[in-house]
Amino acid sequence: MISPFLLLAIGTCFASSLVPEKEKDPKYWRDQAQQTLKNALRLQTLNTNVAKNVIMFLGDGMGVSTVTAARILKGQLHHSPGEETKLEMDKFPYVALSKTYNTNAQVPDSAGTATAYLCGVKANEGTVGVSAATQRSQCNTTQGNEVTSILRWAKDAGKSVGIVTTTRVNHATPSASYAHSADRDWYSDNEMPPEALSQGCKDIAYQLMHNIKDIEVIMGGGRKYMFPKNRTDVEYELDEKARGTRLDGLNLIDIWKSFKPKHKHSHYVWNRTDLLALDPHSVDYLLGLFEPGDMQYELNRNNATDPSLSEMVEMAIRILNKNPKGFFLLVEGGRIDHGHHEGKAKQALHEAVEMDQAIGQAGAMTSVEDTLTVVTADHSHVFTFGGYTPRGNSIFGLAPMVSDTDKKPFTAILYGNGPGYKVVGGERENVSMVDYAHNNYQAQSAVPLRHETHGGEDVAVFAKGPMAHLLHGVHEQNYIPHVMAYAACIGANRDHCASASSSGSPSPGPLLLLLALLPLGSLF
């Protein structure tokens, strides 16, 4: 057995050989730092324009360790060592931290957090679009405790609005933008208890079609929740799990169509080919449901039937951008979270790289002069990578050392808990005997669990565009939509823009200095 110290020494020598020649010259690092300093000094001139458009990218489960690992993967996919690569979100000038806890949970879930960063109030885990006065699964605690989202505020201000996700369109993140539910799992009436139905609560898919009837763009998965129970799916005709789920017999696609004005052009599509064939200039309303449940992982995506997140974002912006009053767009890279829960780090990180591609696509189609873009996560995961790996080491590769106890190697990527806890012959599995580069390889975990869990640490918030500087420190997660609304002059922040306009000011700037100087605690 090779000594772990020898392995570390070999790894260190190997790392030295991977150092790019230009990085050996101190001038390279000094010039880079000076350029970064110049860029930072230019930020002294604040962008206080009104945000005509607001785009929010939500990487579900995209904690800081996931961001870093995705950065390395992006670089390695382009044949570089990876560590020096810049994600699109890395280029944003303003970065903050968001405290993710729910009102009743130290380590949060995606529903309570979605209510925070979309509706501006913290809530209990498992609930969407309601205050903390609503208890999970208790329908009778819902009425009177509903809270509205920034999507609603934007719609009320005359803007176009859109939702794009790689999960079901009635999943936790998107549902908080339009629904009010005591339970995030009430996807259709089939998932609701009889008591909740008898008390008048509606399932989330029903609320999607009825609560805000004029959402211009809705794209993601979740077809089966829109159709009567046992209705055969258009794509997976022989798959019983893909069949319709609704007990009330409603066809929500038909209902969606019936709500649209006759003089407007509405389109429902279920595959990539039909989506890309659309002329966005002749589309007023778009509903795209590309899977019965969640959309496929990016690595598993069928190019004929499944659009990428980038493609959906491009189509959404082309449709929404026609409104002279602007738009609000929520984009979720939702399957980052699913990959981590399954212990499949490769799936999770490729999802994160694709979301970053979508961020770049949106940036190319908009301007920082009138578009506020915010990128953040709802929570993190117990995902880590380490082990003194050398520069350029495959992010999915082995660490250059072995365990002090069982003398076996380990991958750089590990989970604190999850399904990757493998015991073979009474001992930890020897990862050198398995294909740890496989797309569905489950990285080893310290504690055996069927599903890996969320993490409780703060997550990053990246921002660019009008008023992005208001995201500048450590904030409660529910602060985020208040900033977006202030920048766009919508919701509770309309009055200050009206007064600024009447006084001849072109932006919400008059209150800016006051906001910047006040301690965060005095604002909420």
From Swiss-Prot:
GO terms for biological process: biomineral tissue development; bone mineralization; positive regulation of cold-induced thermogenesis. InterPro entries: Alkaline_phosphatase (IPR001952), Alkaline_phosphatase_AS (IPR018299), Alkaline_phosphatase_core_sf (IPR017850). It is an enzyme of class 3 (hydrolase). A lipid is attached at residue 499 (GPI-anchor amidated serine). Keywords: Biomineralization, Calcium, Cell membrane, Disulfide bond, Glycoprotein, GPI-anchor, Hydrolase, Lipoprotein, Magnesium, Membrane, Metal-binding, Mitochondrion, Phosphoprotein, Signal, Zinc. The keyword rRNA processing does not apply. CDD domains: ALP. Zn(2+) 1 binds at residues 60, 110, 378-379. The active site is at 110 (phosphoserine intermediate). Phosphatase activity is specifically inhibited by 5-((5-chloro-2-methoxyphenyl)sulfonamido)nicotinamide (SBI-425). N-glycosylated. GO terms for cellular component: extracellular membrane-bounded organelle; mitochondrial intermembrane space; mitochondrial membrane; plasma membrane; side of membrane. GO terms for molecular function: ADP phosphatase activity; alkaline phosphatase activity; ATP hydrolysis activity; calcium ion binding; inorganic diphosphate phosphatase activity; phosphoamidase activity; phosphoethanolamine phosphatase activity; pyridoxal phosphatase activity. Zn(2+) 2 binds at residues 337, 341, 454. Its EC number is 3.1.3.1, 3.9.1.1. Glycans are attached at residues 140, 230, 271, 303, 430. PROSITE patterns: ALKALINE_PHOSPHATASE. The keyword Cell membrane applies. Residues 1-17 form the signal peptide. SMART domains: alkPPc. Residues 500-524 form a propeptide. It catalyses: a phosphate monoester + H2O = an alcohol + phosphate; diphosphate + H2O = 2 phosphate + H(+); pyridoxal 5'-phosphate + H2O = pyridoxal + phosphate; phosphoethanolamine + H2O = ethanolamine + phosphate. Calcium-binding is structural and does not influence the alkaline phosphatase activity. At very high concentrations, calcium can however substitute for zinc at zinc-binding sites, leading to strongly reduced enzyme activity. Homodimer. This is Alkaline phosphatase, tissue-nonspecific isozyme. It comes from Bos taurus (Bovine). The gene is ALPL.
